[in-house]
Amino acid sequence: MRLAIGGMVAGMAATGFAGRARAADSKTGVTPDQALDKLRQGNLRFMSEPQACVADLAQARQRVAEGQAPWASVLTCADSRVAPELVFGGLGPGDIFVCRNAGNIADTVVLGTLEYGVIALGSPLIMVIGHARCGAVAAACDVVIKKQKFPGSIGPMLKPILPAALAVAQKSGDVIDLAIRENARRQAEHVMSSSSIIAKAVKAGKVKIVAAYYSLDDGKVEILS
């Protein structure tokens, strides 16, 4: 890990962020809207023909061995049932730049990762995906509604999700599902409001940020914003 991080930092220092960004822009050749459409079409393929969503890993591995130009960045939950490469139609290595943690939280590590995707890799789309029956969001709702406490690092981990749970706690319907959707929206907004690098790229029309919701039942990815 130390060598990998050191190499990444050295590479960025040697070429400069601006230079890397210009090179990455030409590498992807994909606009934000085109990237979103590619994800939508891939998800439709996953829903209709899941058996066909298998990547040719050997060929893809050779294609990206010397570099990457992912055309979308995805922040999703660490839940084992949510596999973005499959959900979007059997994508292979090098297609999407993926961040995963419990509750799809845009914390400092994720923000830095997404910024790297924008600056160094030229990724034109950032999608934040919440999913049905998310355990992290359900736990945050338990903290808000039932005053439940969780051991170890789980309690602090849930703090960024609490505002979403609080926002929907008094609403009718499935509070957990409402909170999952609200959290995805808020985390997407947090990416924009907390990163001047990404905000600048969005304002320039080079990057789009969207929130989405993944159904475990039918495999559909619903765009929320």
Language model features with spans:
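Short HxH-centered metal-ligating active-site micro-motif
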Residues: 32, 83-174, 180, 186, ...
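N-terminal short beta-loop-beta anion/metal-coordinating cradle
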Residues: 53-93
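Divalent metal-coordination and catalytic microenvironments
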Residues: 39, 74, 99, 128, ...
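Short coil/turn connectors at secondary-structure junctions
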Residues: 68-71, 93-96, 121-125, 204-205, ...
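Charged, glycine-interspersed solvent-exposed loop segments at helix/strand-loop junctions
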Residues: 170-210
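N-terminal export signals
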Residues: 1-21
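C-terminal segment of N-terminal export signals and the immediately downstream linker at the start
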Residues: 15-48, 52-56
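GST superfamily/GST-like fold recognition
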Residues: 203-223
